Amino acid sequence: MGQTAQDWKEVVQQLSISDVDCPELFSSTEDEISYLKILGNLEQRYSEVKEPLRICGLSLGALLAINFAIRHEEKVASLVLIGAQYKVPSLLIDFQNFIFRCMPNKAFESMGLSKSSTIKWAHSMRSLDFTSQLNNIRCPVTVLCGKKDTANLKASKQLKELLPQATLHIVPNAGHELNKYAPNTIAEILNN
């Protein structure tokens, strides 16, 4: 959340392929935004793609990648999930929304969403739980998590256990935004 395609520039520049798409998940022109609307926009965006996708997602992007792979198994060649949750911790969302309510409206401008839209969007994810559907993901999966990303480390380890085909990489001295802390690591994994 709060990232743009520009935040992935350092990773993308190191990739051995040129056909890379970093979709913007939020649009300031949309009045109402929800998790399902973002997922629907991605499904529409990739509906005509013939070749299976190699999807890399961080945080919300990882959650969307998991959901997309469950819903469109035939369209996904592999997943790289960074700082991933597969079951949204409702207490964390509630705490996050409490913090959001205390923040000034100006703090949300860089995301392209208003404060109220951000709170509604976060609330729309409150009940997401893909635990029972993870066995539908059959493609290779790489799970990455920064050692300092304490909010997602446990879930990343559990995800590795729930997906037998998954490999787990804990990146030392890195926090949540691995595209900023360890772009070389992500690029190396995506290039293999």
What are these regions (language model features)?
Residues 2, 9-13, 19-54:
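Active-site loop/oxyanion-hole signature of alpha/beta-hydrolase fold enzymes
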Residues 174-184:
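Catalytic histidine-centered segment of alpha/beta-hydrolase-like enzymes
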Residues 1, 57-62:
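Conserved alpha/beta-hydrolase "nucleophile elbow" surrounding the catalytic nucleophile
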